[in-house]
Amino acid sequence: MDAASAAGIDRAPFELFLIEEAALLDQRRFRDWMALFTEDGTYWVPAEPDQESPFNQASLFYDDRDLMKTRIDRLEHPRIHIQTPPSRTAHLIGNTIVETADEAAGEFLIGSTVIMVEYRDEQQRLFAGRQRHRLRRDGDSFRIVQKRVDLINCDGAFEAMAVPI
């Protein structure tokens, strides 16, 4: 099903899924967040606008399940200096659209806007951009095949980013 056909699909279940995903991140429930991904799922934050591939240049994040687990292990370690004190975040998800849908295969491409505010060590940082979730139906919910976050300032200078957006 193409984008024109996807326009008639109810976006409410997808919005709810994205809001629940953001809540897991805000609650620092990183292992529950990782469980939303398929076994071959990836999380990608490109370092350049319109970057086509995570393989031909650097990315801010490009994690498969193994790298997600390693990153989460580090985030949960009691002596991780980059997270002392731990970050507190608030995500806002909006402008959700069903871009493409293949209902027979149970696969959907969902676009949305994301804003994340991170507060740590008396400093506040703001991240904003468009995100695209490639979702696969899993019973009454979905699993993430790929999450791509295109930050509006992806090619800017960043201090270390530890928590997922």
Language-model region placement:
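Short, low-complexity N-terminal intrinsically disordered segments enriched in polar/charged residues
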Residues: M1-E39
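Hydrophobic transmembrane alpha-helix bundles
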Residues: E20, R65-R79, I115-R132
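General N-terminal targeting signals
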Residues: L25, A35, G41-T42, A58-L60, ...
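A generic "alpha-helical surface" signal
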Residues: A12-L16, S59, D66, L126
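Conserved aromatic-histidine-acidic binding/catalytic patches
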Residues: A6-I9, N56, Q123
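A solvent-exposed, acidic/Ser-Thr-rich amphipathic alpha-helical stretch
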Residues: E39-I110
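A beta-strand edge to alpha-helix "cap/lid" segment located at domain peripheries
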Residues: A90, I97-I165
